[in-house]
Amino acid sequence: MCHFTRGIGSRGFCALLALAAPALAQGKTPVVIELVLALDSSASVDAREFQLQNEGIALAFRDPEVLLAVDNLKPFGAAIAIVQWGGPGETQVVLPFTHIEGARDAKAFGFRVTLVRRWMRASVTSLAAGIADSAALLEANAFEGQRKVIDVSGDGPDNSGGDLEAARNNALASGITINGLSIEAEEAGLHAYYLEHVIIGADSFAEPAQGFEDFARAIKEKLLRELRPLGS
C-alpha cells in the first residue's frame, strides 16, 4: 500500500515505487523520462541556423524555469541524449544519454551542448531515419523511464522516400512518444505536417518555432511540457 511521503504526493510516491522496481530488476537506472533531442542536420539547415539550434538548447538548460522543472524530477531525474539526423544511416549521437539528477547536472549538460560540433550536412531530410535511430537509442540505453520521448526538430518534411509512417508506428509500439518542433523557416504548412505525420503517442504535441531565431523560445517551452514530475 502506498502512503503519503514528505515532498512527494501519494500518487507520485506510488509512481515512484512502480518505476523503481522494474528498472532495478532489469539492472537499469530508474528515471522519470528518457528523452532524445533529435536535431535536423540536413542540407536545408545552414551553419548559422544549426548554431541557433545548439545555442537554443544550451540556453534552455540554463533557464531558471527549466532548472526548476529538472529539480522537480527528483529523486530519479531524467536521462537525456542529443542526436543529429539527416539522411538514412547518417544519424550521429553527439551527446550520449546523461543522467540529469538536478539543476547542477542540467547546467553542466547545457555547457556540453556549447561544445558540440556539426557532424554532417546531409543531402536529404529523413525524418523516418531520425525517428527510427532515436527509438533504437531509447531501447538500448542503461536507463528505464516512466516516459520515453523523442523530441524531433526540423525545418522541412521527409523527402528521403523513407517510411515515416512505419517509423513512428514502430516507436509507438515500443511505448515511445514522439513530439515535434517545427521550424517555420521556408516550408509553408510545416506545423500542420508535424501534427499529422510526425507526432504520435500519449500526450504528444508539436511546438512551432517562427524561424530559427525563435528556436530558443520554442525548445524551452517544449522542455517545460516534457519535464513534468513523476506521476503527473
Go through each PLM region and give its residues:
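Second-shell loop/turn segments in exported
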Residues: 38-48, 80, 96-99, 113-124, ...
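Exposed acidic/Ser/Thr-rich ligand/metal-binding surfaces
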Residues: 118, 122-174, 224, 228, ...
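Bacterial N-terminal signal peptides that target proteins for export
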Residues: 1-13
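Von Willebrand factor A/integrin I-like adhesion domains
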Residues: 183-231
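Von Willebrand factor
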Residues: 29-96, 100, 104-153, 180-190, ...
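N-terminal signal peptide c-region/cleavage motif recognized by signal peptidases
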Residues: 20-22
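VWA/integrin I-like adhesion module and closely mimicked acidic/polar interface patches used
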Residues: 70, 156-197
